[in-house]
Amino acid sequence: TSSCAEYTPYIQTVTTIFMALFGVNFTVYFLLLQRKFRQALHSSELWTYVGIILTATLAISVNIYRSMPSFGQAVHHAAFTVSSIITTTGYGTLDFNLWPEFSRVILCFLMIVGACAGGGFKVSRIVILCKYAKNELERLIHPRTVKVVKVDGKQVSKETVHGVLVYTLFYILIAMASMLLVSLDNFDASTTISSV
């Protein structure tokens, strides 16, 4: 039941790196195999994913460092847990239920992202939604502006954007309905939200 907690910090660090690497969109690896390094490294999805991991790791590290022997250990455990949660791998070095509420909420958001091929909302959809939202905000300021959603310099079709919006709507509705069903068992809000 101790998951990866029994392993040395070195093995945990290697596991962290590989969990994070395998959460990257497989298209990036395909581009690297084709020696299209510039195109692979300019992937907005890749940098959004890296940004999410780094931001979450830093925020959680700062939040939990008082309960750790050193800031380095806080970063170590935060990075491992963030990589595990965002990739839906499920490994652990510590019981993050003992962490402050702020850190657990961040982990709940990361569970939704689900960067790997196995499940979750996906970083690519987040990128498309953010670019669409930016275009809509610009349209509020300049109503005659005609904007298209572009990802990595390529136009995303209206059908794809529409599909992402519909998927997002249903994702939220199903999550809310599931939370309501789980709440019938009188769990606290944190348990209800994280169990969905």
Language-model segments: which ranges?
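Membrane-proximal intracellular helices of multi-pass ion channels
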Residues: 1-196
